Structure formats: C-alpha cells, structure tokens
Amino acid sequence: MGLRAKFLTVLVAGILWVGCSGGSTEDAYIEQAGVIHQNALTIDGHVEIPANYATREVDPGRDNDFQVDLPKLLAGEMDSIFLVIDPGRTASDTEDIASMQAGTIRGLEAIHRLAEEMYPNEFEIAYSADDIERIVGSGKLAASIGIENGLMIGHEIVHIETYFNLGGRYMALPHEIHSEPVDIEMFPGEEFDEAGLDSLHQQIIAEMNRLGMVVDVSHLSRTAMLEAVNLSRAPVIASNSAIRKLRDHSWNLDDDQLVALRDSGGVVQVVAFGALLTEDAALRRREYNNIRGAFGMIPGQQPEELGAEPYEDYMGRMEALDERYPDATVADFVDHVDYAIRAIGIDHVGISSDFDGGGGIPGWNHAGEGLNVTIELVRRGYSEVDIEKLWGGNLLRVLREVESVALRLGES
C-alpha cells in the first residue's frame, strides 16, 4: 500500500493525457482508479540510471529533466522502483570488461549514495521482497537494484556475489547471447544471432540461483531465452519486454516464450517503450532522430535553441511527423498487457517503464503519470486485486520464490 503523501486528488485532472473523454462513466473510472492506485504497492520494474547518477549534476531528489526523480515519484504514488545499471553493451577485450566492471561498481555506489547519504529519509535500499514491504510501510521509497548486462562478469563468476552483496537483485545475462539489434526501430525480417547458452552462461545461472538473484531474460536471443528458462531452478523475469504477436521485434516475446516464462513461475514485465509497442512508434522514433540530425542537434538540445527561422521549420516537420506516425499510447501499452494476460494468466504479468533508458509514452512519460495506466486497466474491467498483481504483487512473488530456492540450495 502506497504511503507517500497523497497528491492524487489534485493531480488527476492535470496528468490525464489529451483525448480522455468526459462523462460520468469516465469520471467513475478515474475515481475508482485513484483509490486503487493509492492502495496498491506500486513497483516500476525497470528504471535506468545515468553514469553520473546521485551527483550534483544528476540529483534524483530534485525535479529535473529525467523521467524519474523524487518529486515525480511522489506525485505518481510510486512506492518502489528497480534502479537499473547498464554498464555497456559490448566488450572486445579484457580492458573493456574491466571498464564495465568499474562502471557497475560506480552505479551500485551511486544508488547507495542516494539512499544512505543524500536522501536517507526518502529512500532505502531493498534487499528482499520483505524489505520492499517494510520500507514502503515505513513511508519511504524502496529502491531495488537491477543490472542490465552480465557481460562485465567476463569469466570471473565471483563478481556476481560482489554485485549481489551490494544489492543487485536481478541481472540480465551477457549481451553476446542477446538478440541485440543495430537499433531499436528494427522491423520484421531483421533477425539477429540465435546464439544459445554455453558452459559459462550455465555457471552464471547456477550462481544466481544459489545467491537468490533473479535471472532476467529480456533481449536474449530466442534460443538463449528458452534455454535459460529451462536451466534456471528458480523463476525468471523479462524485466522490459513486450509482445511479439503485436509488434514483431526480436526483443519481444512470442507465445512459446511467454508459456515457458509462465511454466517457470516467472513474470513478463511489459515495458512502455513505444518502439516495442507499435510499428508506427518505431518509424516515428527513427524519423525523429533523422530530423534532429538534419538540424545538427546534439542530445538534450531543445528546439528553442535553434533560432527563430530554424525553429519554425523544425516544428513544422514535427507536426507532419505527428500526423504520419502517431506515437504509441497508454492504450497500446495495455493492449500488450491484455495479450500477455490472455496468453499466460494474470499471475505472470507485470509493468515496467524503462524510463531514462528510452521508455515512456504519451500519458506515461514520467514517474508522475503512472495513474494513467491504472485508469486504462480499470476502463478495461480489471479488478483491484488484478491491478495490485500487475503493479507489483506478481514481481514480489517471484522475488520471494527466488529467495526460497536460494535457501533450499544452501541447505542441500
């Protein structure tokens, strides 16, 4: 149950996305969703952090340009987040791996700095499912830790225990067995390596099971994903994936993968990443980047900085882009949630944003807008119990089951 200061009453009207229809039925949905959202223990299963996180440059306690910060989390009634460290996607030699290892440690230290030095009254690191519930019950935000890419382990399995002891509670397997596209806007027919698991990957899974660290199968090749699910002695998660039947992308999960995930006892955390939800959103993202490139814009540069005439040209192109390739919506996102529930049951589906890692859609584009997801779920007939499972209950169950497997392995 969320125990943050309750801002929903005054914020509901302000955060609803454009196009929400009026009328008594819609008002009833909004009112019902507000109550459910307040009462649920809400967990965002995947939020990425930048390399300079928890510094003067990137202060998570202040309202800033990032999609997740303390004011937005409070406004959105979020109770818990998985802060995810992405140490990099490729490593060609031992020097690269050492650099990735150092980056992972810096990320872990940054999250500890956030919770233990900068904002100890607002955040606390959660090391278990029970910790999440205890921390939320105390009125703080529970900060759990995920790791995007296990490639930095190299051939030294001992690093996994180091990351676990510092709070890492899920980790994606190394990216050399990932279905890693050249860009996120790939389309049907653009397939990538179907590499499977080797003995090192098997050792990594065994060690994660022993420790009680959740195996994250998002973005693996199809072959590697199915092998990982079968090898793991504990349930697995896909921390930021969507549904391949609705958007044919190799990062998304097909029906066989969904069933395998369910049979492991795991959860797919459906991600609000537009290019993984609709093809139009992928085309939009590609064209958007092309437009910015044509104006020589650097990351973070605002169009107002272009000057009067280029600004008008830029805005004209953006208006045309809006008409040609509409962005994915909260309804599109919940379409993927719906499909997963029909395919494998509501006990195996969760929610993640991938905020500050490319995620976010109109209506749920920062941590302050999570209520809009709950409104759409209510609109489609989901009950309070259903919504509580989707927003965090199912993920908590997986964490507990993974912890239990580790205890049993330790006793054997």
Predicted ranges, named:
Residues 20-194, 244, 248-412:
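N-terminal hydrophobic targeting/anchoring segments and the immediately downstream early-domain regions
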Residues 9-19:
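Bacterial N-terminal signal peptides
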Residues 1-8:
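Bacterial N-terminal signal peptides that target proteins for export
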Residues 203-217, 223-227, 257-263:
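Substrate-binding cleft of carbohydrate-active enzyme catalytic domains
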Residues 196-208, 228-236:
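Alpha-helix-loop-beta-strand connector modules within alpha/beta enzyme cores
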Residues 182-186, 197, 224-228:
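Active-site-adjacent beta->alpha loops and helix N-cap segments on the catalytic face
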Residues 2, 234, 243-244, 368:
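Charged catalytic cores and adjacent phosphate/nucleic-acid-binding surfaces used
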Residues 240:
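Conserved active-site aspartate in kinases
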